[in-house]
Amino acid sequence: MSFDPNLLHNNGHNGYPNGTSAALRETGVIEKLLTSYGFIQCSERQARLFFHCSQYNGNLQDLKVGDDVEFEVSSDRRTGKPIAVKLVKIKQEILPEERMNGQVVCAVPHNLESKSPAAPGQSPTGSVCYERNGEVFYLTYTPEDVEGNVQLETGDKINFVIDNNKHTGAVSARNIMLLKKKQARCQGVVCAMKEAFGFIERGDVVKEIFFHYSEFKGDLETLQPGDDVEFTIKDRNGKEVATDVRLLPQGTVIFEDISIEHFEGTVTKVIPKVPSKNQNDPLPGRIKVDFVIPKELPFGDKDTKSKVTLLEGDHVRFNISTDRRDKLERATNIEVLSNTFQFTNEAREMGVIAAMRDGFGFIKCVDRDVRMFFHFSEILDGNQLHIADEVEFTVVPDMLSAQRNHAIRIKKLPKGTVSFHSHSDHRFLGTVEKEATFSNPKTTSPNKGKEKEAEDGIIAYDDCGVKLTIAFQAKDVEGSTSPQIGDKVEFSISDKQRPGQQVATCVRLLGRNSNSKRLLGYVATLKDNFGFIETANHDKEIFFHYSEFSGDVDSLELGDMVEYSLSKGKGNKVSAEKVNKTHSVNGITEEADPTIYSGKVIRPLRSVDPTQTEYQGMIEIVEEGDMKGEVYPFGIVGMANKGDCLQKGESVKFQLCVLGQNAQTMAYNITPLRRATVECVKDQFGFINYEVGDSKKLFFHVKEVQDGIELQAGDEVEFSVILNQRTGKCSACNVWRVCEGPKAVAAPRPDRLVNRLKNITLDDASAPRLMVLRQPRGPDNSMGFGAERKIRQAGVID
């Protein structure tokens, strides 16, 4: 657009305030400003006027959008449109003194002009906010409104004056002063988490800071100790707390610098296993390093590479960690050197891995008779141990139980290093003078208390005419039977690794003492490959294996009298050996009392209820009389039917008799009084309504029914109950029918069927009828049917 200043309707009159013109002047605001022209928004009327920059009286560089100006109105000769001429910038009014405090909401972008230069008179803007009467207001500002050479950032605290443009009504912030820069975000690592709050170890100072879970900006379920976070510190109730907590990528926060070089030193102070109450030092351990100037470095329980116990005097290798926050040095990545045992005063022992469990195991010791417990964490050099591996270790008392020992600092040894015995091939004969016993059965848990020590046995033997004795251990006996006093044995002599100590090994039983006492008993229980014998006093039961029975095991029956000897096997358990079936020579000492009593079983035999500790059963007299309430014991001999299984609470009839070597009055000839009804009968078996144990029904086979009677449901029967020793299940035998049950009466036809039949109308001619036109034909003993199958049309009869 071209403009000629001489084309104005002012006849060359200058029209400035100092001139003589009486033309009316108006005021307005620069709305748009370009290189050579611009536009003015009139203040007194709704008009927008063009002006040429040549009409401005002053430095054009000082003129910008929003400035108040005074001007005259003229008209363009070419277009006739009104234009503004003779522009004068109006001086700004004095700003009010009241200043507001606020905060930068959106800062003016940095380097905006270099990226996209603005046109003359146009400046980038930002926004600030302030609060008044609980309400927040937002204002714009430009870089020219900031006092001093200050670059504002979002979040900065500021002080400013509110400016209201009377021409446009726009409100903005002017004379902005920076009060406080926004606090930088801090970083740290979550070190502890409680129910509703946690603590962060700060990355700038050696200090922890509290934070509430409501301040965590993210999924709280994913937050866990060790996570890197950033946060803002605020003051609440006089204490610093972390707010606006956010997760950082793992590895962002680094507290310390670890040296690449490895150092060697000596442990001068170990970390106590049980810290004292007044111990506040987080790094209680000490390692001495021989630098030019000797120095002691602290270390904590997390600075060791493994959980192997450290001892004073240990030679170790480590790195030095320097804390970035306070420059504190400490030893870390500590590992025990292989030659450390040359400098410590510990007594090392050897053994073989005997058992491995989940996280712990047991070592068979060369110099100890008990197996030594150890934790996997005590294995040196990160080796993985297996059963039969040879190891070296140190024995220390358990911190939780001083009566127990356990192995620490376990080092794997080459195969063939550990030797339990060095014995000759020469065999000796001797006689047992003292029996050897085992320790308590081994447990898989280290927290069962102190185990009982095993006791050595003594063997007397003759060597070149000299009578000598030698010790032997129960674990060195061959076979399952332990030798007893007076038994003849064969053995070898071995030198253990303990200096100057000889023991008998490979001990084999040659013969029992001929003077050993033979005992009588009665077969009480028969299992698959073992059984139990009731003693002659009828108060205990003795285990025996079928391999100890002389004769055909199938010929043994419950109640048979047997003769046996006692022996102690592994685990100090007493068992019967050399069991022989004998005749009843020392049975009942007196005739049974002919009086028959009625009673109730208040405790069954142990073979019926294995959970009870007592072997004998007990019967209480229930019939009226002087003896009512008296209780008498019974055993397998007292049963009329030795295979009968008496349950607690069953009614019985019995006699009294003096039995056993101690002449004890016991129940004898016990017969149960059982009556019940038949529940149902299948093909070859049935069930009786009788409760035994957890079962409400009692099984019986039809071959157990006496006299070949066919039982029906509802029949009342008497029977005996036998216990299958192999399966542990009970069944009925010797089933007698006492009386027949009620005959089954045909049930009447249900009413619904009767009503349905009544509603059928046979005379209804319209009802559908089914008529048989041809009976089906079967095969005629030929190679198929004579009539060929053809495709027929439905509903059409040939």
Swiss-Prot record:
Residues 748-789 form the SUZ-C domain. GO terms for biological process: CRD-mediated mRNA stabilization; IRES-dependent viral translational initiation; male gonad development; negative regulation of nuclear-transcribed mRNA catabolic process, deadenylation-dependent decay; nuclear-transcribed mRNA catabolic process, no-go decay; positive regulation of cytoplasmic translation; positive regulation of translation; regulation of translational initiation. SUPFAM superfamilies: Nucleic acid-binding proteins. It is found in: Cytoplasm; Cytoplasm, Stress granule; Cytoplasm, P-body. It comes from the Eukaryota. One of its GO terms (molecular function) is RISC complex binding. The keyword Transmembrane helix does not apply. One of its GO terms (cellular component) is cytoplasmic stress granule. Residues 26-87, 136-179, 186-245, 297-337, 349-410, 447-507, 519-579, 610-670, 674-735 form the CSD domain. There is a cross-link at K91 (Glycyl lysine isopeptide (Lys-Gly) (interchain with G-Cter in SUMO2)). The modification Phosphoserine is found at S123, S276, S514, S584. The modification Phosphothreonine is found at T761. The keyword Methyltransferase does not apply. The modification N6-acetyllysine is found at K81. PROSITE patterns: CSD_1, CSD_2, SUZ_C. It holds the Pfam family CSDE1. Keywords: Acetylation, Cytoplasm, Isopeptide bond, Phosphoprotein, Repeat, RNA-binding, Ubl conjugation. Its main location: cytoplasm. Belongs to the UNR family. Component of a multi subunit autoregulatory ribonucleoprotein complex (ARC), at least composed of IGF2BP1, PABPC1 and CSDE1. Interacts with STRAP. Part of a complex associated with the FOS mCRD domain and consisting of PABPC1, PAIP1, HNRPD and SYNCRIP. The interaction with PABPC1 is direct and RNA-independent. Interacts with EIF4ENIF1/4E-T. RNA-binding protein involved in translationally coupled mRNA turnover. Implicated with other RNA-binding proteins in the cytoplasmic deadenylation/translational and decay interplay of the FOS mRNA mediated by the major coding-region determinant of instability (mCRD) domain. Required for efficient formation of stress granules. This is Cold shock domain-containing protein E1. It comes from Homo sapiens (Human). The lineage of its organism: Eukaryota, Metazoa, Chordata, Craniata, Vertebrata.
